[in-house]
């Protein structure tokens, strides 16, 4: 959410004419869509209010999450460079940049539109600008974060149009959140936020229904979530009576004895701490195979999934993403590409995924 999405965001300010190299092999599929104008959003006031019927949430965990992210200050780029987890923030931003470059369309004959669910403070706006998109809508449950995202967008002089809304994509239909002319996108992004939907089956189905409605055939849903396989591995390593694991950077704590299985796959709550980012906030396990199976029922087919550290090992020396690490200053304590120490263990808690919309 306000991590939305990015639990941790960090990157350099944009510079003119700086674009990441764009791989072409990823985008051989045909995306069905209606003709769109370049000024898709220009008839709106960017207030984030048009067409949005405010959804009041009564869930206690949801209120805690919203309050947590609303309370986090937007420190600005320079102050963020002094974060005690700056290497982790840079690494996570590199992961998201890789994900965007691999799966966001790179077409030039029609506008590319993005829906960022759980956009937070707008930490991915620069990434989308570099991807050459034409339109962007960000939605987040934390109203303060949405206002900070609007401010960041205004100050960055982006090459794309954007609107921001305060709303809950996990509890409200997209028809309640967005007006009719703002409900079709080429990419839906869910960065460091989808685990909150797994509080209940209903929320997961509302989310996936919204994603499916927003995407044409060939559109993609991309995201980053905690890796349920890693959670299982740590649970198996716990001694009787132990309920948590982690290090000085991050901690995972179950309120009761950790479950030995993830059935049913919803409502498996734990508390997450990440230094300088998340303070003991309730989150939910996302059993990945259950997620994949439910997504298929909404015509969303898994096309790619990898743990963060596997992405690092596979891409750090590639022609495209290796130099990107250098530019984003993603280096360990010895100056090598990557991440080390306790921050590496924290990064290993996550995976990235991509689904493609099939059918209609």
UniProtKB/Swiss-Prot annotation:
Enzyme class, first EC level, given as a word: transferase
Q: Where in the cell is it found?
A: Nucleus
One annotated GO molecular function is: RNA binding
What is its biological role? Responsible for methylating the 5'-cap structure of mRNAs.
The record ties this protein, via InterPro entries, to: mRNA_G-N7_MeTrfase_dom, mRNA_G-N7_MeTrfase_euk, RG7MT1, SAM-dependent_MTases_sf
Reaction(s) catalyzed by this protein?
a 5'-end (5'-triphosphoguanosine)-ribonucleoside in mRNA + S-adenosyl-L-methionine = a 5'-end (N(7)-methyl 5'-triphosphoguanosine)-ribonucleoside in mRNA + S-adenosyl-L-homocysteine
> What quaternary structure, including any partners, is listed in this protein's UniProt entry?
Interacts with cdk9.
Residues the record annotates as the site (mRNA cap binding) are: 121, 127, 152, 195, 283, 350
Q: Which family does it belong to?
A: Belongs to the class I-like SAM-binding methyltransferase superfamily. mRNA cap 0 methyltransferase family.
Annotated positions binding mRNA: 92-93
Q: Which GO terms describe its cellular component?
A: nucleus; P-TEFb-cap methyltransferase complex
Kindly provide the name given to this protein in its UniProt entry: mRNA cap guanine-N(7) methyltransferase
Organism expressing this protein natively: Schizosaccharomyces pombe (strain 972 / ATCC 24843) (Fission yeast)
Q: Where is the region Disordered?
A: 1-62
**Principal localisation:** nucleus
> What positions does the entry give for S-adenosyl-L-methionine binding?
96, 118, 140, 168, 191, 196
